[in-house]
Amino acid sequence: MSTTTIASNAVNGNHYEQLHQGRTKMYKSKVDVVLGAQWGDEGKGKVVDMLASEVDIVCRCQGGNNAGHTVVANGTEFDFHLLPSGVVNEKCISVIGNGVVIHLPSLFDEVLKNEAKGLIHLENRLIISDRAHLVFDFHQHVDGMQEAEKGGKSLGTTKKGIGPAYSSKATRNGIRVGELLGEFNLFSEKFKSIVNTHLRLFPSIKVDIDAELVRYKDYAEKIRPYVKDTICFLHTALRNGKTILVEGANAAMLDIDFGTYPYVTSSNCSIGGVLTGLGLPPQTIGEVIGVVKAYTTRVGDGPFPTEQLNEIGDLLQTRGFEVGVTTKRKRRCGWLDIPLLQYTSLVNGYTCICITKLDILDTLAEIKVGVSYRRSNGDKLDHFPGTISELGGIEVEYAILPGWQTSTEHVRNFKELPENAQSYVRFLESHLSVPVRWVGVGKGRESIINVH
């Protein structure tokens, strides 16, 4: 290699480095992300509510009204399915991103119900992406039919039309919010086309096209004030130093790629879904907060290695009030699963952890934690199984930790927790090699203990 070439490469290297640094400096702030580390229902909404008091913008990036988050603010319990949990903070803007699929009747119903509980001025602080896809009633009918056809092998879908809507998106015949707000005759033609496609595939569903078009013409005007290009909005916010928090819906083990497929949802509930669901580049991501329930729960069917079909499972279900916000189904309950958490941490790159519902374990004399998986032949697994048949055939090895058998409900300082409760937290921390920053011991935001 000549001296000239070496010099040229050095100059180019400096040039590209300068360009990279310049691009990085475009953004004066970062995007922090809250993700569910198990199968959902970890308490992400409460964590978002706590953090939302310190940020300018809170975003939803994927999923639809199949998600359910409960937030207790000033003694009032709010249930959210499409709205970001941070919407209870009147000082921040809430964003529904392009990766979300929206059933407009459910969205407006959710707004009305929560306004009746005291949610105010939403019209000034909710922004909806013009690129978000719409969920129609026929998507929900199809969802129910497809689930019924599976018989004993059902996936436990919420029947909210989420999967069929994402299918329409993937096959490029879905309809986006922006199209509803454009020329209505173009929307009408596209709506008729997608309905007719579904009628050919599912002849038994009934759709009154004319009545639906009348309804959606009304919806168009109702939603119009909320809609804008959220991608430009978020990038402008970052360049201006605005703080942004993203609330992941569902959870890592329900991710379409990384979860226990096919017992998953139809979107990416991991860190990748944040980027594609909001139009953000990787360098904008700051903290990635994994929310971990102190035990494990799951709604619906699918493998669950540490599930306890006994009095322990019943106790966790009863003490934890484990009933789905969206489905109202009882959640299956079991011990904490370290291999599962190590896997979701690997995928998501958690920078810190929030443990929730530690107080539910208060009455137990001893607590088990799943620490490794073995095949039926005794071989230890060094990875999380990629198929449900492999996962269904594993045996869990448990560590047994002493309980604390005293109430933690009113503790507000980590050092005031019982010693065994502190040890339980440190046990998880050491096995994940990720710091635990918060511990939850109750429902409200005031019950979250800052560990450090």
From Swiss-Prot:
Pathway(s) where this gene product acts: Purine metabolism; AMP biosynthesis via de novo pathway; AMP from IMP: step 1/2
Textual note on the cofactor: Binds 1 Mg(2+) ion per subunit.
Biological process according to GO: 'de novo' AMP biosynthetic process; IMP metabolic process
UniProt binding sites for IMP: 41-44, 66-69, 158, 172, 250, 265, 329
Enzyme Commission code: 6.3.4.4
Annotated binding of substrate, by residue: 325-331
Catalysed reaction, written as an equation: IMP + L-aspartate + GTP = N(6)-(1,2-dicarboxyethyl)-AMP + GDP + phosphate + 2 H(+)
Binding site for Mg(2+): 41, 68
Compartments, record wording: Cytoplasm
Positions with a binding annotation for GTP: 40-46, 68-70, 331, 357-359, 440-442
Active site (UniProt): 41, 69
Required cofactor(s): Mg(2+)
GO CC terms: cytoplasm
UniProt keyword list: Cytoplasm, GTP-binding, Ligase, Magnesium, Metal-binding, Nucleotide-binding, Purine biosynthesis
Keyword Nucleotide-binding: yes
MF annotations from Gene Ontology: adenylosuccinate synthase activity; GTP binding; magnesium ion binding
InterPro entries reported in the protein's UniProt record: Adenylosuccin_syn_GTP-bd, Adenylosuccin_syn_Lys_AS, Adenylosuccinate_synth_dom1, Adenylosuccinate_synth_dom2, Adenylosuccinate_synth_dom3, Adenylosuccinate_synthetase, P-loop_NTPase
Chain's role: Plays an important role in the de novo pathway and in the salvage pathway of purine nucleotide biosynthesis. Catalyzes the first committed step in the biosynthesis of AMP from IMP.
Family (UniProt): Belongs to the adenylosuccinate synthetase family.
Listed NCBIfam families: PRK01117.1, purA
Assembly with partners or alone: Homodimer.
Stated name of the protein: Adenylosuccinate synthetase
Native source species: Drosophila grimshawi
